[in-house]
């Protein structure tokens, strides 16, 4: 934003362009609440500002600035922008972009008189309705060369940008100033022209004035002056605008190579000439009328014979006559000076004023009706005299021409009477035509004057066209104007929204297409397309009796109810009648069609036009010189034909001319780079500063302002080609682009932009250009300017440094020279007083004196010579100087001449170019005329020559007839031969019919078998569905009843039995397919037999074709002769027509003579006699002409007779043949060969032969088609059967399809190989896992001390498991790829088959239509037969190879089965080991139960513990409720997921440690049993020692109690922390359980869908494989492999589960072993005090034992559940289920351990109390117990660490399983789509089979029909023979006649 100092250059315009700094600071500091400040929708003012008071249930209460309170919906409020965006210059920069924000920004700027605002890529201007100082010269200078962002918004900124774009981009520009009428378009257009005329002056005005003598001003002045002149004659006051342009103009300002003005031209569109004679009440006519009557120039009033009162002239005073905002007197002076500046001559200027005055007088001409007649006559001649005087006419002639016009009726001219209304309309039409032509002539003269002939390179076009108009009365002019605005708006929309986004797509930029809903095509097409409004209007204008009513009816019939934009208007009282309504983009407009036909035809009184052409006012004569009247046309004499043509071409309706000009305009605009200025009308009352919200909003919506801002903000409005960008902006970082090596412009641009410090999201790279967001290019330009400034500064510094160094070097050299001189002078000064040196000085000159004397003498001589030479040279020099002066003068003169000649040469070159163009056009016309003349001469010569040749040709025809007789004899022989062939063919067809019947039976049988297989497959699918349902039920039973492992095995066996049953059904289906293949082989053998028979037929057909070709050649020769004779007849007809034209010319001349006689005066008797004589002469000439025509007809008749004698006198036979020819021509090209029957009977014979050949071919085609249809039906079962019944061309195509199917076989085999590889990989992985299991089991049995080693092996096993999962997912993805590829290939094959079917149908039709195609097809059949045989052999080889491959695969399958059996055996062994370990676990459980009975005595002491346990259970129930509530906070827990996972790991580790401690307690119980006996024996001995140790124990106990108290406090704190963590973790675990359950369900469903689709896929694959030989076994084996792989995978998962269980038990056992060893040592160190605490400990142990048994039982149940889930669910679901079970088990263990910790703490408390009582021994026992607990804590910590590791592994596994689930889901969907497509194909094949049956029936009917036609052809051949005999007789008679005549 510029400062106030920078804005000072704009002078007094600064406050009208940009806010001051003070206002900006105040706006930024103004208080603003972004949450409550809003715009709210309000009915009266559309939107008002307000603040939100409250919100309630979708309703918002807003208090407006006016104090009103509104309650609206939330979608009716819009957020307000911060204050810093108030009066923003570019609305695209606003934070909140919506309608109220744009409206209020415009309103606030308009209130501050800032009328220009940017809106993205274009400028919006609001009409101020007052003068503002924003167009002053200092403003023009301030905007010159400024970038858009550097200066405030202004029309000058748009203009300067267009100018700069033209110079930099070297592309034509255009500025489209659009908007509604009264929005300020004309003013902005003038300002644009003013700007260009100011900044781009030519600079050489003197030269310009010298080169163009007529010019009164410079080019700049002329361009500016064109506007006042055009406005005076083309602008008028309307309801909405005081200075409305009533015509459109497109001003092109041309610039030279340097950017200076070169020339200009103006194109105008659609002047509203109806305004000349009619205005509405609130409007007035064109300004010129009122300027003239303003009396500013009284000489005009006198010259034009008018008054100063406009009301004296009805044409210009029907509305208002004055406008407050226009000074007509000043405008008249401006118009007058503009005429002078634009170079109009004085005569032309006077003519303009005179014709304008004549138009005014025309409105005063009055006519009245004659008495008792309808004829009009003048009502006074005074006005007519004035008008005629001003037009240079005779008033009497003018009145006569108006009242009695001459009209052409036929070939005569008649004087027509006119009514008063007709004369008045004619006067108005003449006035409008004269004014329009004068306006267009003025534009042409302006263009001539503005054309300076200077070289022009580019132009900037400024479009100012009438805005959208909605008046009370809308006529044809309004429709044209509104249609133009529709086109311009569509251009704007297309350029701004569609082209912009299409270029993004074309350039490859990521862009989502935005439909802004701005397509106006419907309304445009309604107006301009065929059968649109303009089309119907022009059509009605062509009909003489058309009326407005008929036009309206046609419009209603064509569009009412059919087009949404065309409506019937409602009748409103007080408004003008409307006939139809159109919905335009700016609103609905009612149109009145009254007088549209006349307006469109624009009829003129031709008699008056003829007077105009003879006017003494040269301008008027010139205006109408191009009009070709009927009389002038008639008087053109010999050029009548040319004149008629010119009149026909000149008749063009107004609408057609308008559309032509509009299309040219749109073409010009599309070739330029457009800049849009959208003018807005603020109010209807023309009040300055007032703005009507709804009116402005309507214009914003219609003009696309909001959409333009959006596309500017979202899109990339600036773009540069890569090469241009690299060249222009390389300076920003030259190092980014390496020098000396080639680099692509795109890569260079990418590197350059990447190295610059800018926002890299603000640009995108396209294919050819780099695209920038709005504003970024300006930033780059600023950076470039700064960089250039730096570079130039650096260059200047380097240059200055170089110059300084050069100067310094010179100084150094001068210094050295000075030192040398000083040295020499000092040396001289030292020796000059030395005596010897003085002697040297004296003697040395004397030594050289003699020599010097000689030299002096020679020098004197040379001096004398040089003196003489100097005198001579001086004389010569003076002469040369004189010559030089003269030559310089001549040179200057020559330069001036050369300059003038160069300019003349440029003009001459342009003229030469124009002359060359005209010469080329004239040469083309001359060439056409000469060619026509030559053609006429050739035709005449040919006629004479052909007349002479007719007799010769008659004799030749006789010879031909003799030849035909000979050929006829041959043809008869051939006919007998063909009859025999036809009989043979009919016999063969009978055989073929039998084979067809057999084939149909076989087809039905195959269809039944196919249907049976489909039914079987459906039954299998039903079984699979029932099985899946049963499986689901079983899964539910597993979840509900927790069945045992034996039940799962039973279910598995049931499933395997079902699978075996399905496999057996599949084998049965495969056996049926083998039977079908055997039948196919039999059909192949039959096909070979048929092919052999067809080859024999082909050889016969080829022989007949050779004969047929010879006959056709002869027929064509005869036909050519007949055509020549017909051409001669046509030539005679042409000569006759020429004679008739000459007769019409003579009649025209006679009529003209009679008319001239009538015009010369009255009809005297002498003249009547002369007329009679001339009529007699005319009759005589007519008779002569008729005789001549009769002679021509006689000659033509003689020619026809001769032709009939030679050929056509063949009589009835030729007539019959001609009728046959006509009939055959109507049947298009079906029987094309029968046309030759016109020549001779030979053609009939050849036609019969052709019919026979056609029958043969059609029969063959029918057979082939039946076979092809049969093959299509059988393709579902076996695609190879498609070769049956086809001819060799069709069989070739289907053999290619067979190749494709074989390719599919190879693909499937490759897929099978891929599957086998996958299976082998699975085997290897299974072997590795089994080895790992064996190693682990061996390690478990051998030693429990290798825990760490086994743990590492377990981790490796998990990694291998993950690898297996990845490999399996990869294999599944490959399978999916193969399936998709197979699917696409299958679809392509079916599409190709359907295309082949269509091609076959086309070929059948072509064979029926073109019998000649038999020759080529017969030749191709032999080739295709050989190729087919080769392909069949290749196919047999391929089949053998596939069979061998199948055998190899069988061997591999058997080996794989053996391997699987071995794995099963190993699995059973491991399972047995697992069961043994479980039995051991049960035995341990029983021992624990026994121990529990032994410790029942301590139950009394545990009652207190039980109460506390109940309290804890209550707390646990509360915690479970909290866990349920925690499931609702899933999204919150996800945020702290990382922390929770860490805590979960710690907690799970603690749970595992607790579990280990429980297991440790079990081992402890066993040890205690052993120790009890020893303890009993020692108790008696230690009782005596008890009393002695009590005192010591008390002291020790006090210390222990204190330490225990501290430890208990720490334990309480840790317990509280653990409880808190537990609550969090329980919520997390519950959430994870829900997620796991959900994923389990999803996985189960996906698995069920997967299995269903797998079953369907197998069935469909089996159906598809039926079409491929030998593929059934492959499919079956593939299915078996997949099932076995699934079983193996399930078994692997079971083994993994059991392995994990054994691993867990192994770990527990190891931990127990360690604990046991520690406890043994501790027990040995314990004292006898354990006897008293033994019972308490035994009760604790018994309680723990019971809880442990429950835990073990729960673990067993969980294991059984996990096994069931593993067997029934898929691989992924099993893993997830296992994780869920383990997490539940850990949760239960955690709870139990918490309980045990509490119990232990209670026991500790009790132990303390007992210790106080029991003494020293009890204290020792408690201390030992404390140590035990500390050891347990340490072991728990170790287990915690191990659990963390395990938990992380499980988490990784869960992620892998979720990924695998997603892949399986995608595969299932893909398979489902494939199944749907294959089912659709099966249905289409069924439908095709039915169609084939129908086609076979139709072919049989066609065959019978052809047989019938063959019989008819034989009858016609017999008839032809009899006709030939008749022709022979007639030819002999003709011959005898000719001989007798000669």
UniProtKB/Swiss-Prot annotation:
**A GO CC term?**
A band
IQ domain ranges (all copies): 788-817
Locate the compositionally biased regions of type Basic and acidic residues. 1131-1159
GO BP terms in the entry? response to muscle activity
Residue ranges the record marks as coiled coil: 849-1930
Q: In which tissues is it expressed?
A: Expressed in type 2a myofibers in the tibialis anterior and soleus muscles (at protein level).
- The answer to whether keyword rRNA-binding applies is no
- For region Actin-binding, the annotated ranges are 662-684
Q: How does it assemble?
A: Muscle myosin is a hexameric protein that consists of 2 heavy chain subunits (MHC), 2 alkali light chain subunits (MLC) and 2 regulatory light chain subunits (MLC-2). Interacts with GCSAM.
Q: What is this protein called?
A: Myosin-2
Q: Which organism is it from?
A: Mus musculus
Q: What is the lineage of its organism?
A: Eukaryota, Metazoa, Chordata, Craniata, Vertebrata
């Amino acid at each position: 934003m510029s400062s106030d100092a920078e804005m000072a250059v704009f002078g007094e315009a600064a406050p009208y362009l940009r806010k001051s700094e003070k206002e900006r600071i105040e706006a930024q500091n103004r208080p603003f609440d972004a949450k409550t400040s809003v715009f709210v929708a309000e009915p009266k003012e559309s939107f008002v500002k307000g603040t939100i008071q409250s919100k309630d249930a979708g309703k918002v209460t807003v208090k407006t600035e006016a104090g009103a309170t509104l309650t609206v919906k939330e979608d009716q409020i819009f957020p307000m922008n911060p204050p810093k965006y108030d009066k923003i210059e570019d609305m695209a920069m606003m934070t909140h972009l919506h309608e109220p924000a744009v409206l209020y920004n415009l309103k606030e700027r308009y209130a501050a008189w800032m009328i220009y605002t940017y809106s993205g890529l274009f400028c919006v201007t609001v009409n101020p309705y007052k003068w503002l100082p924003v167009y002053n010269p200092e403003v023009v200078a301030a905007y010159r060369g400024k970038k858009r962002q550097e200066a405030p918004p202004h029309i000058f900124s748009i203009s300067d940008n267009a100018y700069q774009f033209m110079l930099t981009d070297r592309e034509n520009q255009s500025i489209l100033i659009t908007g509604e009428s009264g929005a300020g378009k004309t003013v902005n257009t003038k300002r644009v022209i003013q700007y260009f005329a100011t900044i781009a002056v030519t600079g050489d005005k003197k030269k310009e004035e010298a080169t163009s003598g007529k010019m009164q001003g410079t080019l700049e002045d002329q361009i500016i002056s064109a506007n006042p002149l055009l406005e005076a004659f083309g602008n008028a006051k309307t309801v909405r605008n005081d200075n409305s342009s009533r015509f459109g103009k497109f001003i092109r300002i041309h610039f030279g190579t340097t950017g200076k003005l070169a020339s200009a031209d103006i194109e105008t569109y659609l002047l509203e000439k109806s305004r000349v004679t009619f205005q509405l009440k609130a409007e007035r006519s064109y300004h010129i009328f009122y300027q003239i009557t303003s009396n500013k120039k009284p000489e005009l009033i006198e010259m034009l014979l008018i008054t100063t009162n406009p009301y004296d002239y009805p044409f210009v005073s029907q509305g208002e006559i004055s406008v407050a905002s226009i000074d007509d007197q000043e405008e008249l002076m401006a118009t007058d000076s503009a005429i002078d500046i634009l170079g109009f001559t004085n005569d032309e200027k006077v003519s303009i004023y005179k014709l304008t005055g004549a138009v005014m007088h025309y409105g005063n001409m009055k006519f009245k009706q004659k008495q008792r007649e309808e004829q009009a006559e003048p009502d006074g001649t005074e006005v007519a005299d004035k008008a005629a005087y001003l037009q240079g006419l005779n008033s009497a002639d003018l009145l006569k021409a108006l009242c009695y016009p001459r009209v052409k009726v036929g070939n005569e001219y008649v004087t027509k009477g006119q009514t008063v209304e007709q004369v008045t309309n004619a006067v108005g039409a003449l006035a409008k035509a004269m004014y329009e032509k004068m306006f267009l002539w003025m534009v042409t003269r302006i263009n001539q004057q503005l054309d300076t002939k200077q070289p022009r390179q580019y132009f900037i076009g400024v479009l100012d066209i009438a805005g959208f108009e909605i008046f009370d009365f809308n006529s044809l002019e309004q429709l044209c104007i509104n249609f133009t605005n529709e086109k311009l708006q569509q251009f704007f929309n297309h350029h701004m929204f569609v082209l912009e986004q299409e270029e993004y797509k074309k350039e490859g930029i990521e862009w989502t297409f935005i439909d802004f809903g701005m397509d106006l095509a419907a309304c445009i097409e309604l107006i301009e397309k065929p059968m649109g409004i303009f089309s119907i209007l022009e059509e009605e204008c062509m009909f003489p009796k058309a009326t407005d009513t008929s036009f309206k009816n046609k419009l209603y019939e064509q569009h009412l109810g059919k087009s949404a934009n065309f409506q019937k208007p409602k009748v409103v009282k007080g408004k003008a009648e409307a006939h139809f309504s159109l919905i335009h983009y700016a609103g609905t407009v009612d149109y009145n069609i009254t007088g549209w036909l006349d307006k469109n035809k624009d009829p003129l009184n031709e008699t008056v036009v003829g007077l105009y052409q003879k006017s003494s006012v040269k301008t008027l004569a010139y205006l109408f010189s191009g009009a070709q009247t009927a009389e002038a046309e008639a008087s053109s004499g010999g050029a009548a034909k040319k004149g008629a043509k010119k009149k026909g071409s000149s008749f063009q309706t107004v609408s057609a001319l308008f559309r032509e000009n509009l299309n040219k305009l749109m073409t010009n605009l599309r070739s330029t780079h457009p800049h849009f200025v959208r003018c807005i009308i603020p109010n209807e009352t023309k009040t300055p500063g007032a703005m009507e919200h709804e009116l402005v909003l309507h214009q914003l919506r219609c003009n696309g302002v909001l959409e333009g801002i959006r596309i500017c903000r979202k899109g990339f409005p600036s773009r540069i080609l890569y090469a241009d960008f690299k060249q222009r902006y390389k300076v920003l970082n030259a190092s980014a682009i390496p020098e000396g090596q080639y680099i692509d412009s795109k890569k260079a641009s990418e590197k350059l932009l990447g190295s610059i410090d800018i926002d890299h999201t603000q640009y995108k790279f396209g294919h050819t250009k780099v695209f920038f967001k709005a504003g970024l290019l300006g930033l780059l330009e600023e950076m470039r300017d700064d960089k250039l400034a730096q570079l130039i500064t650096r260059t200047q510094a380097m240059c200055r440094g170089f110059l300084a160094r050069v100067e310094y070097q010179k100084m150094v050299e001068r210094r050295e020279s000075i030192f040398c001189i000083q040295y020499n002078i000092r040396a001289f000064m030292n020796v000059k007083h030395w005596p010897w040196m003085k002697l040297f000085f004296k003697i040395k000159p004397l030594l050289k004196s003699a020599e010097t004397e000689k030299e002096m003498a020679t020098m004197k001589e040379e001096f004398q010579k040089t003196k003489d030479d100097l005198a001579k040279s001086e004389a010569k020099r003076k002469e040369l100087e004189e010559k030089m002066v003269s030559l310089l003068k001549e040179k200057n003169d020559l330069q001036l001449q050369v300059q003038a000649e160069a300019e003349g040469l440029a003009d001459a070159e342009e003229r030469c170019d124009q002359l060359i163009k005209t010469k080329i056009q004239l040469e083309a016309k001359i060439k056409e005329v000469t060619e026509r003349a030559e053609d006429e001469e050739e035709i005449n010569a040919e006629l004479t020559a052909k007349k002479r040749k007719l007799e010769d040709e008659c004799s030749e025809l006789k010879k031909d007839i003799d030849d035909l007789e000979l050929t006829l004899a041959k043809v008869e022989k051939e006919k007998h031969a063909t009859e025999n062939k036809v009989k043979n063919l009919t016999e063969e067809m009978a055989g073929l019919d039998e084979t067809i019947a057999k084939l149909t039976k076989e087809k039905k049988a195959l269809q039944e078998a196919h249907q049976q297989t489909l039914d079987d497959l459906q039954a299998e699918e039903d079984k699979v569905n029932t099985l899946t349902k049963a499986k689901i039920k079983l899964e539910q039973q597993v979840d509900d009843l927790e069945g045992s492992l034996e039940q799962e095995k039973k279910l598995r066996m049931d499933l395997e039995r079902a699978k075996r049953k399905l496999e057996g059904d599949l084998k049965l289906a495969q056996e049926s397919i083998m039977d079908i293949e055997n039948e196919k082989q039999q059909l192949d053998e039959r096909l070979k037999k048929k092919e052999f028979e067809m080859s024999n037929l082909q050889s016969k057909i080829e022989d007949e074709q050779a004969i047929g070709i010879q006959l056709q050649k002869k027929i064509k020769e005869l036909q050519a002769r007949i055509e020549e004779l017909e051409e001669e007849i046509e030539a005679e007809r042409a000569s006759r027509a020429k004679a008739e034209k000459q007769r019409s010319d003579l009649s025209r001349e006679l009529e003209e003579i009679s008319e001239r006689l009538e015009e010369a005066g009255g009809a005297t008797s002498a003249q009547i006699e002369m007329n009679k004589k001339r009529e007699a002469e005319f009759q005589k000439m007519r008779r002569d002409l008729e005789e001549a025509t009769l002679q021509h007809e006689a000659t033509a008749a003689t020619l026809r007779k001769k032709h009939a004698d030679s050929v056509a006198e063949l009589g009835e036979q030729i007539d019959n043949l001609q009728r046959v020819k006509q009939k055959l021509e109507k049947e298009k090209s079906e029987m094309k060969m029968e046309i030759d029957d016109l020549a001779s009977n030979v053609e009939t014979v050849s036609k019969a032969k052709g019919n026979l050949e056609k029958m043969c071919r059609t029969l063959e085609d029918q057979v082939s088609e039946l076979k092809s249809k049969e093959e299509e039906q059988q393709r579902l079962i076996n695609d190879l059967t498609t070769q049956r019944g086809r001819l060799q061309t069709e069989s070739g195509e289907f053999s290619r399809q067979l190749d494709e199917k074989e390719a599919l076989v190879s693909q499937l085999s490759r897929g099978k190989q891929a599957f086998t590889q996958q299976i082998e990989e699975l085997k290897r992985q299974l072997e590795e896992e089994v080895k790992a299991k064996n190693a682990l089991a061996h390690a478990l049995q051998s030693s429990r001390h290798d825990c760490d080693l086994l743990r590492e092996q377990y981790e490796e096993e998990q990694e291998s498991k993950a690898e297996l999962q990845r490999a399996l997912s990869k294999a599944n993805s490959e399978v999916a790829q193969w399936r998709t590829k197979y699917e696409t290939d299958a679809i392509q094959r079916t599409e190709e088959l359907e295309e082949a079917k269509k091609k076959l149908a086309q070929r059948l039709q072509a064979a029926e239509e073109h019998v000649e195609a038999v020759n080529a097809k017969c030749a191709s059949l032999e080739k295709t037969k050989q190729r087919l045989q080769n392909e069949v052999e290749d196919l047999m080889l391929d089949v053998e190879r596939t069979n061998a491959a199948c055998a190899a695969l069988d061997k591999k399958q058997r080996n794989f089965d053996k391997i699987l059996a071995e794995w099963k055996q190993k699995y059973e062994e491991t399972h047995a080991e697992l069961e043994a370990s479980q039995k051991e676990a049960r035995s341990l459980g029983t021992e624990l139960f026994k121990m529990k009975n032994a410790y029942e005595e301590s139950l009394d002491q545990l009652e207190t513990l039980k109460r506390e346990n109940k309290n804890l259970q209550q707390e646990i129930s509360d915690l479970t409720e909290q866990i349920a509530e925690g499931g609702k906070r899933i999204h919150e827990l996800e945020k702290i997921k990382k922390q929770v996972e860490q805590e979960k790991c710690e907690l799970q580790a603690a749970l595992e440690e607790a579990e280990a401690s429980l297991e440790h307690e079990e081992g402890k119980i066993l040890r205690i049993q052993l120790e009890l006996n020893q303890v009993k024996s020692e108790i008696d001995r230690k009782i005596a020692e008890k009393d002695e140790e009590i005192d010591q124990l008390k002291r020790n106990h006090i210390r222990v109690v204190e330490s225990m108290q501290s430890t208990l406090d720490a334990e309480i704190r840790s317990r509280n922390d653990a409880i808190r963590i537990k609550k969090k973790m329980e919520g997390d675990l519950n959430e994870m359980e829900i997620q796991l359950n959900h994923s389990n369900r999803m996985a189960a469903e996906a698995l069920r869908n997967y299995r269903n689709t797998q079953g369907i896929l197998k069935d469909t694959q089996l159906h598809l494989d039926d079409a491929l030989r030998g593929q059934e076994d492959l499919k079956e084996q593939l299915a078996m492999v997949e099932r076995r792989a699934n079983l193996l995978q399930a078994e692997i998962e079971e083994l993994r589960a059991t392995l994990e269980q054994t691993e867990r038990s192994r770990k527990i056992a190891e931990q127990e072993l360690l604990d046991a060893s520690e406890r043994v040592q501790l027990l040995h160190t314990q004292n006898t005090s354990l006897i008293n605490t033994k019972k308490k400990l035994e009760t604790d142990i018994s309680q723990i034992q019971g809880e442990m048994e429950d835990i073990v039982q729960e673990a067993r149940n969980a294991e059984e559940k996990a096994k069931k889930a593993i067997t029934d669910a898929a691989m992924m679901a099993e893993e997830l289920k296992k994780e869920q079970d383990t997490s539940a088990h850990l949760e239960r263990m955690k709870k139990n351990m918490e309980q045990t910790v509490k119990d232990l703490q209670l026991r500790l408390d009790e132990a303390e109390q007992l210790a106080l009582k029991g003494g020293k021994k009890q204290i020792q026992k408690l201390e030992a117990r404390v140590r035990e607990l500390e050891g347990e804590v340490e072991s728990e910590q170790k287990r915690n660490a191990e659990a963390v590791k395990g938990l992380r592994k499980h988490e990784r596994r869960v992620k892998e399983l979720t990924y695998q689930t997603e892949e399986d889901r995608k595969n299932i969907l893909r398979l489902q789509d494939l199944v749907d497509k294959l089912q659709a194909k099966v249905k289409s094949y069924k439908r095709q089979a039915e169609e084939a049956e129908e086609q076979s029936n139709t072919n049989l009917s066609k065959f019978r029909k052809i047989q019938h036609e063959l019989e008819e052809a034989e009858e016609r051949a017999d008839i032809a023979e009899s006709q030939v005999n008749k022709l022979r007789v007639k030819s002999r008679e003709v011959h005898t006649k000719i001989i007798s005549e000669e």
